[in-house]
């Protein structure tokens, strides 16, 4: 079924003629533009609180989950064991991305687990699934394709969309399976990476937390490594907007990624928030996290005040337990390679690849939304009518979402405030079966701040919508810091390559990479995009394919110099030629136009809080610089074709390789 057929099925049956539909579309477009214009006029970019230096918020940068003294002692043992040593491979980040880097290079046979050191600021494996333990947490992409290495570990997820605790335990399962549990150094903050041109290695410096001293005492970190892989994730640290007089508030505050069960009651495994029965709770933010949190807060709080700037588009979820009989039949019928094929089936539908597969294996809200390919790209993205075709699909879909709000929420004013008036690709689509219904509860109040914003905090709460709201507990569902552009910047690591060149400078002044994973003058340093690499909705697929690509580059290089066996690896220096990375940057630029549709969106993190709307006023030089920072514009399938064909040539074309000894 093509996009037109899907769109026709969701059209308002009271308006079926083409002329009527065009009139409806024109009216909707006017409403979208009015909403965007209003938010651009009233929505200033609020600076973020520096949670590392502000004493009121410093607890947000600490690890609240290490209450096991044995675990703390084990972490400190590995800190002492690994600090000050040289390692063949240093992986910064111990979430799914870091684990995939480790597993894929081990699978090449060129390295063992003992050659690898993983470091992370947290106290365990999991990345975002380590830090986030809020009530209602689950993945919003099908767990059978989101949870990596299911085929290799033999694990069957409990439900179509797995819970947070299950996702965290799976990270630990991967570490145990590949003997990585003893190759991790937790409580580590890498502050700088410097290339040693004489020694041909990377030097990492930073801080190591002392968990026995309430995470207040920090020792110096010094490591060196032949290869470094950055896998610290897309979102570096919790974002707390620096609202006016926020420090004057006397009540309790916490961020969703540092959920305080001591305040709310319950636990990640049993989130009964029994301590909120006499509390007025305020949650700020209504993005993908809040969609999962609000139903739980609504159930247990005396009062829940939801402060909303832009409503999310919330479709149905329809989660259900995994049927073991179906699972075993699926494994038997699909055979080896089933997970990768299932992932790519999902990519084909969400990336609007043509022709589409005969069977939609996932069959959920994502795969029936080809218009979201505006974000990740599609092979047809550069077609002159592509945006028009995606709008033709998206208009009726968004109207169906708004109709769902009207049907579910009893109060008409609240329903209108919860209705999304923007294209479906402007804000991450959400899927939940209980969020909208929560606003029918008598203890839940929606405060719409899209026009006036949050004015200021007071000792008892905050002022918004012209009056003071007294709140006992504030929950910040305000996302993560995303302001910096380079892989080092997002991880808050100062990276300096050859001849004193910083990564931030290169990203801001003519970024060029080879395939979005390596850049000249930063030898042996690898990163998983997203600039100049392919991206897709299922982020673990992207991470896995980039990890596989990096593993190929390193192992093929070692084969080329005659050192392919683990245990014998003379030092080698790998980086792209200037010509190769410039050629790749030009190819990225040629496909960058697809991202221009974001300028028509309400402000959000997809368009850097509306900055895309200011593109017209930039010089051509600045536009070209920004164009180099985007992801591959034709979608993940096209990107994979590029790198698979490159590997198929077997020449490591575009790479400069030097053997050190």
UniProtKB/Swiss-Prot annotation:
GO terms for cellular component: membrane. Disruption phenotype: Completely abolishes the production of novofumigatonin, but accumulates asnovolin J. Keywords: FAD, Flavoprotein, Glycoprotein, Membrane, Monooxygenase, NADP, Oxidoreductase, Transmembrane, Transmembrane helix. The chain crosses the membrane at residues 89-111. It is found in: Membrane. NADP(+) binds at residues 138-140, 286-292, 309-310. PANTHER family: FAD-BINDING MONOOXYGENASE AUSB-RELATED, L-ORNITHINE N(5)-MONOOXYGENASE-RELATED. Belongs to the FAD-binding monooxygenase family. This is Chermesin D/asnovolin J monooxidase nvfH. The gene is nvfH.
């Amino acid at each position: 079924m093509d996009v037109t057929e899907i769109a026709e099925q969701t059209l308002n049956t009271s308006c079926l003629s083409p002329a009527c539909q065009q009139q409806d579309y024109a009216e909707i477009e006017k409403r979208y533009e009015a909403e965007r214009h209003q938010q651009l006029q009233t929505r200033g970019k609020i600076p973020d609180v520096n949670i590392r230096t502000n004493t009121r918020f410093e607890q947000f940068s600490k690890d609240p989950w290490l209450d096991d003294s044995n675990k703390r002692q084990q972490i400190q043992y590995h800190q002492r064991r690994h600090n000050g040593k040289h390692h063949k491979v240093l992986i910064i980040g111990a979430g799914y991305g870091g684990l995939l880097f480790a597993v894929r290079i081990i699978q090449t046979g060129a390295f063992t687990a003992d050659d690898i050191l993983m470091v992370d600021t947290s106290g365990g494996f999991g990345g975002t699934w380590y830090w986030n333990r809020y009530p209602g947490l689950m993945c919003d992409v099908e767990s059978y394709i989101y949870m990596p290495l299911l085929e290799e570990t033999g694990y069957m997820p409990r439900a179509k969309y797995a819970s947070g605790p299950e996702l965290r335990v799976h990270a630990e399962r991967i570490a145990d399976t590949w003997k990585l549990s003893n190759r991790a150094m937790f409580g580590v903050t890498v502050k700088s990476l410097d290339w040693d041109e004489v020694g041909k290695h990377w030097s990492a410096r930073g801080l190591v937390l002392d968990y026995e001293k309430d995470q207040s005492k920090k020792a110096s970190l010094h490591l060196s490594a032949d290869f470094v892989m950055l896998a610290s994730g897309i979102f570096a640290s919790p974002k707390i907007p620096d609202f006016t007089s926020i420090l004057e508030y006397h009540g309790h505050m916490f961020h969703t990624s540092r959920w305080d069960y001591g305040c709310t009651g319950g636990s990640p495994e049993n989130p009964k928030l029994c301590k909120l029965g006499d509390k007025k709770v305020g949650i700020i933010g209504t993005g993908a996290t809040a969609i999962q949190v609000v139903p739980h807060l609504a159930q247990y709080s005396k009062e829940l005040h939801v402060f909303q700037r832009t409503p999310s588009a919330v479709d149905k979820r329809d989660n259900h337990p995994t049927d073991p009989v179906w699972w075993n039949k699926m494994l038997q019928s699909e055979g080896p390679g089933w997970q990768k094929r299932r992932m790519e089936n999902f990519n084909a539908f969400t990336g609007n690849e043509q022709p589409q597969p005969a069977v939609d294996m996932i069959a959920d809200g994502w795969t029936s939304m080809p218009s979201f390919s505006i974000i990740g790209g599609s092979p047809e993205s550069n077609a002159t009518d592509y945006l028009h075709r995606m709008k033709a699909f998206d208009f009726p879909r968004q109207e169906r979402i708004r109709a769902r709000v009207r049907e579910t929420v009893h109060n008409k004013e609240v329903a209108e405030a919860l209705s999304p008036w923007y294209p479906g690709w402007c804000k991450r689509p959400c899927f939940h079966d209980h969020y909208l219904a929560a606003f029918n509860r008598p203890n839940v109040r929606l405060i719409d701040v899209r026009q006036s914003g949050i004015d200021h905090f007071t000792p008892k709460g905050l002022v918004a919508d012209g009056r003071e709201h007294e709140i006992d507990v504030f929950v910040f569902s305000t996302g993560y810091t995303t302001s910096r552009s380079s892989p080092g910047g997002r991880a808050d690591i100062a990276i300096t390559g050859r001849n004193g060149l910083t990564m931030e400078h290169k990203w801001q002044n003519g970024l060029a990479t080879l395939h979005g994973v390596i850049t000249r003058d930063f030898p042996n340093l690898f990163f998983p995009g997203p600039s100049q690499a392919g991206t897709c909705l299922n982020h673990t697929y992207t991470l896995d394919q980039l990890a596989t690509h990096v593993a190929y580059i390193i192992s093929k290089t070692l084969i080329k110099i005659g050192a392919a066996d683990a245990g014998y690896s003379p030092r080698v220096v790998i980086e792209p030629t200037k010509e190769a990375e410039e050629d790749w940057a030009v190819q990225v630029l040629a496909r960058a136009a697809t991202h221009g549709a974001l300028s028509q969106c309400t402000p959000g993190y997809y368009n850097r809080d509306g900055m895309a709307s200011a593109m017209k006023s930039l010089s051509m030089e600045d536009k070209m610089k920004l164009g180099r920072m985007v992801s591959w514009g034709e979608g993940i399938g096209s990107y994979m074709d590029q790198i698979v064909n490159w590997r198929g040539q077997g020449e490591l074309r575009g790479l400069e390789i030097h053997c050190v000894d």
